Amino acid sequence: MKPNIHPDNYRTVLFFDSSANEGWLIRSCAETHGKTMVWTDGKEYPLFSLDTSSASHPVYTGKQRNVNTEGRASKFNQRFQSVMSSFRKDK
């Protein structure tokens, strides 16, 4: 590897997916904002928290979550209809 081609903050970083309780040690320049975590080897590493990863994403795990499929427009129409019905009763 050529010397002096990597940034100064190129170091081993712990990427940790808290929803799956899994982590990976990877050399990276990712900004960790001073957060650290002790890993299974007993050493403390800079911590980059992940919202989702291959360990927790439904596409990779095969587990689907129940998601409310009702859209924003239909929710608005329901609220608007209740307002309009109360308005019509007043007249």
UniProtKB/Swiss-Prot annotation:
Q: Does the keyword Protease belong to this entry?
A: no
SUPFAM superfamilies the UniProt entry points to: L28p-like (SSF143800)
Report the superkingdom from the record.
Bacteria
Which is a Pfam family this sequence falls into?
Answer: Ribosomal_L31
**Is the keyword Chloroplast assigned to this protein?**
no
The GO annotation for biological process reads: translation
Question: Which InterPro entries would you find in this protein's record?
Answer: Ribosomal_bL28/bL31-like_sf, Ribosomal_bL31, Ribosomal_bL31_B, Ribosomal_bL31_sf
Coiled-coil boundaries? none
Q: List the disulfide bonds.
A: none
Q: Which UniProt keywords apply?
A: Ribonucleoprotein, Ribosomal protein
Assigned GO CC terms? ribonucleoprotein complex; ribosome
GO MF annotation: an example: structural constituent of ribosome
Q: Tell me which family the UniProt entry assigns to this protein.
A: Belongs to the bacterial ribosomal protein bL31 family. Type B subfamily.
- Assembly: Part of the 50S ribosomal subunit.
> What name does UniProt use for this protein?
Large ribosomal subunit protein bL31B
Give the gene name: rpmE2
